[in-house]
Design a protein with these regions (language model features):
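A structural boundary/capping signal
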Residues: 1-165
Length: 165
């Protein structure tokens, strides 16, 4: 099943589903292996920088809560919103650094396709960057706006960390 049920933040009685990011991750990461190899560098930090630079060139439409394009579709359409970019980068980065846990982070008030979303790697990766702490676990943000994550934290909007594997 490519969707999972969720609780609608405004009314528990309303329907709510969101993409099953973990299942989609496993479904598409093998397809992207040849592309991932293009970002292989001397160290993880350089590979991540190359991926981030490449991803920034993909146009970002306004956030789509009622639509989700899996990684291959996002590449074909040459556009991806925050959760689509997060899953695309995760699918590529997992081929280069499978030893580190990756998570999709999103606000708990999200409905449907989460918005906004960030890809994060565990702090034990040694990567430098903006850090978010969720449930006493430090995450390094790899995609999305760190300022927006900080604003949500300051506004007391809880963030959810959904491990991809």
């Amino acid at each position: 099943m490519r969707v999972v049920p969720c609780v609608h933040p405004a009314n528990r009685k309303l329907p709510c589903v969101r993409p099953n990011y973990s299942q989609l991750f496993y479904q598409f990461k093998g397809d992207l292996r040849p592309l991932a190899k293009q970002f292989l560098a001397k160290d993880l930090a350089t590979s991540v920088n190359l991926l981030q630079e490449w991803l920034s060139g993909i146009p970002t439409p306004s956030e789509q809560m009622d639509h989700f394009a899996p990684p291959l579709q996002a590449l074909q359409e040459n556009k991806a919103d925050s959760d689509e970019k997060a899953l695309l980068m995760a699918s590529l980065l997992a081929e280069l650094a499978p030893q580190y846990n990756l998570s999709i982070i999103y606000p708990d008030i999200s409905i449907g396709s989460v918005s906004p979303a960030w890809l994060a790697i565990t702090a034990d990766s040694g990567l430098k960057g903006d850090t978010v702490v969720i449930g006493n676990q430090r995450h390094i943000l790899l995609t999305g706006s760190p300022l927006l994550a900080q604003q949500m934290t300051m506004a007391k909007i809880p963030l959810i960390s959904e491990p991809l594997y």
